Amino acid sequence: MLDIDENAAATVASEIVAAGGNAKAYGCDVAQPESVRVAFHKVLQEGRVQILVNNAGISHVGNLEGTTEPDFDRVFCVNVKGMYNCMQAAVPHMKANGGGIVLNMASIAGTSGLADRFAYSMSKGAVVAMTYSVAKDYLAHKIRCNCISPARVHTPFVDGFLRRNYPGKEQEMFEKLEKSQPIGRMAKPEEIADLAMFLCSEEASFITGTNYPIDGGFLNLRG
């Protein structure tokens, strides 16, 4: 498990171990190639990398005119370059060892675009395109590559985002986000995790080059 916050990653790893699983945590800034290289060197001391889940991401509030070049670069570096860096580290290893699985976390923003989320929408569109390209390029090497495109998911990331950008109006904005979903609520993290587990399992061995919306009807059922 890699995270820019090594202590947070260690906490999750401890929970996994306590539940009977195996996990180790390493600090890593996915936007920095050297940080990724060092982290993957440590990981590879433990054995093969068979599955890579790219889940690091940040957002930014702003339309085209409200997005400065530093804003754009910051989102791109984490959401796009971060996945690129991790795939650059993992895919050659998978290729040399007979195959593997790459799962990228995209967003419905990458398919439909979201108002006031110019940089974020752009970055997630790039994630979808990268997924398709990697799936095509490495099919012969038995590497499957898919992505998941969630709508809004209720996580601490969302709570922090609302506190930073809508101080004093967090609950009002939270309710608006819930109502924006045709299904009437945001997704639970466990619902995204269940799909991720499936796509990384043998049950999904015939699935590659696919973008999976998990959006409570956001793309197709809004009136």
Give the ranges of each region predicted by the language model.
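Conserved glycine-rich Rossmann-like NAD(P)H-binding loop of the short-chain dehydrogenase/reductase
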Residues: 1-11
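Active-site helix of classical SDR
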Residues: 87, 123, 131
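Substrate-binding pocket helix/loop in short-chain dehydrogenase/reductase
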Residues: 63-64, 68-73, 177
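Short C-terminal tail/terminal secondary-structure segment
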Residues: 112, 197, 208-223
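Alpha-helical segment proximal to the catalytic Tyr-Lys
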Residues: 92, 136-140, 205
